[in-house]
């Protein structure tokens, strides 16, 4: 949400460009995933991941001389944006030894601190369809499922999985000076309109560059890169959030200075994108026992869990989880006039009314956001620490001068003194996040494991969203489209709305589809 004054928090003290070099070979780590069809048949897809261009070694095209050192540009090689793009190239990546990135079958692990010739912190990776093209997903009318292990992510870290409306080729077709393209991880954009990118639209971002005052490796340039963003999963072992961010222009576009808005600008709301989003964080919504480390929580973050997110054609977003073979719906929220567990227009309106702000609705809300989910979006997986706000917006009380009595201020149980990058990097260098078992297909198609209760008995179920109002002689309340309609331990409506039927996904969860 408040991403990412240094989403790159710290990395190799070298720079980046948008043509390619060959001093280090580029081999994308393989990663398989599954594409599912109605009825639950899934087929394996052969993919791979690529690290973002901002992490790469960049040097002169005719030598190994750095174009960028520490957090400043070479004045000789990079006197201006155009000259720098001509003089500099970005090189291949040693994924495991330099960046702590490893894959095995359908599993991707991202290490936090990796020490090789220099210190690297975190990484941002994209799923590839081919060696030169990002995999695109059309989320609207479909669901996305994955397994995640956040057990080693303490306060201050964010193991994120999300989608952005960036170009599938990394911008090559639009910007001829970008010859590196998706193969080298170019073209990033998000709803913060990041200005810490070294190259945007095939040009350097050196003009107006200001080195960071608290990070020896980063800075902010005169331009940013904007696009719509769907945060499926921003999380550590303490808190998690689901957040759509609309932009008035859906796809990637360049912005200038404080007109970019977002984390990187003095005027946070001055750009074309919504930097805050309509977030669903169970802890922030009052359910402090749903998600966290240990058996006292409904979802125990010391263990792997499955996350399933469904994008209704109406624009609403549903979420459920599976752990140890048991299904748990998103916990119910009571927020002003809203009661339910679906992220929809009513919820987002209530959140702004109760917690303050209007950025989400100002940028068009879910109606505008549907324009992004109805088109292709690129999958991003990352691990980062936060040099801007210490990740307090995710897992603590934020702003820090607020108290527990301030609606929406408490987002997790972490101390307001936690999350300082220097401390997190020194105290938890071996932290990592693992994403695996990615599945994508029509709503109801990706399925999930079934089985008995978790050790110690059933930890309980969460309240389903409020049933639709019934009419006529229908026997009892009717469950709305995509709502739960059955399963062991379930006591809500079992009759589905007209045009849908109750379909068994596993012994603990049936859904109106």
From Swiss-Prot:
* InterPro entries according to UniProt: CBD_sf, Cellulose-bd_dom_fun, ConA-like_dom_sf, Glyco_hydro_7, Glyco_hydro_7_sf
Bias (Low complexity): 460-478
Gene Ontology MF terms in the entry: cellulose 1,4-beta-cellobiosidase activity; cellulose binding
Localisation per UniProt entry: Secreted
Site feature Not glycosylated, where: 81
Return the Gly residues bias intervals: 449-459
Paired cysteines (S-S): 21-89, 36-42, 67-88, 78-84, 155-414, 189-227, 193-226, 247-273, 255-260, 278-348, 485-502, 496-512
Positions of region (Disordered):
401-480
**Enzyme active site:** 229 (nucleophile), 234 (proton donor/acceptor)
Question: What residues bear Pyrrolidone carboxylic acid in this entry?
Answer: 18
Q: Where is the signal peptide?
A: 1-17
What is the uppermost EC class here?
Answer: hydrolase
Domain annotation CBM1: ranges: 477-513
Q: How is it modified after translation?
A: N-glycosylated. The catalytic core domain comprises three N-linked glycans which each consist of a single N-acetylglucosamine residue.
Ranges for region Catalytic: 18-453
**Catalytic reactions on record:** Hydrolysis of (1->4)-beta-D-glucosidic linkages in cellulose and cellotetraose, releasing cellobiose from the non-reducing ends of the chains
What GO CC annotations are associated with the protein? extracellular region
Know anything about its domains from the record?
The enzyme consists of two functional domains, a catalytic core joined to a carbohydrate-binding domain (CBM) by a serine-, threonine-, and proline-rich, highly glycosylated linker sequence.
Q: Which family does it belong to?
A: Belongs to the glycosyl hydrolase 7 (cellulase C) family.
| Protein name from the UniProt record | Exoglucanase 1
